[in-house]
Structure formats: C-alpha cells, structure tokens
A protein has these predicted regions:
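Donor/substrate-binding cores of folate-linked one-carbon enzymes
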Residues: 3-116
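Sequence-level motif detector for i,i+2 pairs with an aromatic at +2
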Residues: 47, 61-62, 122-124, 155, ...
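Active-site-lining helix/loop region of Rossmann-like oxidoreductase modules
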Residues: 95-152, 159
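An anion-binding loop in the catalytic cleft
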Residues: 129-196
C-alpha cells in the first residue's frame, strides 16, 4: 500500500507470505498517522522523508526496510513536498521488493522520538493572530493547498495560501511596522498582518 491512512485488519496482515509493506511520507517513528507532511511543516521541521516499512497491528509502527530524507525549504508548502516525495520516493518500493526477495530483514523502529500526525480538521488550521509570525507561516504552509489555513475578519472567513515573515532588513511602510496583532495593513500589492 502507499500512504494508506488506516489499519489493515489483523487477520489480513498474515495473509501474504512476506507480509504487507507501506510507503509512508515521514521519517518514522516521527509523524505516524494520516497527515505526516502537513504536521512536519506545521511543527517547523527542517527535514522530512519517506519510509517503506512492514505493516503491523499498530499504526505506522512496523520495522523499516528503506528510508530517504529530503530538506524542507523555508517556503515549501505541504502540496509541494507531497509532489516531491511522490516523485522521488517511489523507487524505494521497488528496491524494498528486491530486498524482500533477497531475504533482507527490516530494522525495528526506535521507541524514542515517536510523534503522531492526526488527520487535519478545519479547526486545526485556524490562524491565531496573536501567535508568532513564524508559527503562522508554518501553519499556512502546512495547510496549503488543502485544507487551507484560515482566519476571520468582520465575521467572514478567508483562506491564506502563502505567507512570508518579514525580516530585519525588509523595507515596509511605517503603518506595517507598527501594526498590532490581528491588524491588517494593505498596500498596492501586499496584505500585511500584525502578529503576536
């Protein structure tokens, strides 16, 4: 299976002679669960990856045959990272099948460093404007393109698909520099949000 977000029934796990394998888009044991790419970006991780592992009764807990790491760029969105991993991690499955045929045994996952990546719900991606700008940026990138981070202004919900944190040398209008948390400042081509 590939990026399967559920559990295979126990009675089916032993049906294939060599068991089941799954291609999972995280560096296990970090980010077990349904939304590993999104959760990695939201947490500010600097790297992600993919693992091919043997399925067991517990979610994403089986021993690992092969893995690969990719850096997460400072502007990378979940959609972009998913596309990259779908393209570059696929050969891991073919190599794993060759390993199984050759009798290679998978390596058990560490019991340390386990994190869970639950499915993303709309409430998980609501922007708290009192948060630090970097946290908001991670949230927006992790939720882009879907489900999309959102905020409310005048009782209207709107999605934000791209953000960029201002840096010390950036030139901005004085109204932007003094914006309070939650205050929006519009210029001709940009919209700025004051953060906590």
């Amino acid at each position: 299976v590939v990026a399967y977000g559920g559990l295979i029934p126990v009675d089916l796990l032993s049906t294939p002679r060599h068991g089941w394998i799954n291609l999972h888009f995280s560096l296990l044991p970090r980010w077990r669960g349904a939304a590993p790419i999104q959760r990695a970006i939201m947490a500010g991780d600097e790297e992600a990856g993919a693992c091919v592992f043997q399925l067991v009764e517990s979610l994403d807990a089986g021993p690992v045959y092969r893995s690969m790491m990719v850096p997460i760029g400072s502007t990378t969105t979940a959609g972009e990272l998913l596309d990259e991993l779908a393209r570059t991690a696929t050969p891991l499955v073919i190599d794993t099948l060759k390993d199984i045929e050759a009798g290679v045994e998978p390596t058990p996952q560490s019991v340390e460093g386990v994190t869970i990546a639950p499915q993303i719900h709309p409430g998980d991606v609501r922007i708290a404007v009192t948060s630090a700008a970097e946290e908001i940026d991670h949230l927006v990138r992790g939720a882009s393109p879907a489900p999309g981070a959102w905020a409310e202004l005048n009782d209207k919900r709107f999605k934000i698909l791209r953000t960029r944190c201002l840096e010390a040398g950036d030139r901005v209008p004085s109204t932007v520099a003094t914006a309070q948390p939650g205050q929006l400042v519009a210029t001709r081509k940009q919209l700025f949000l004051g953060t906590g």
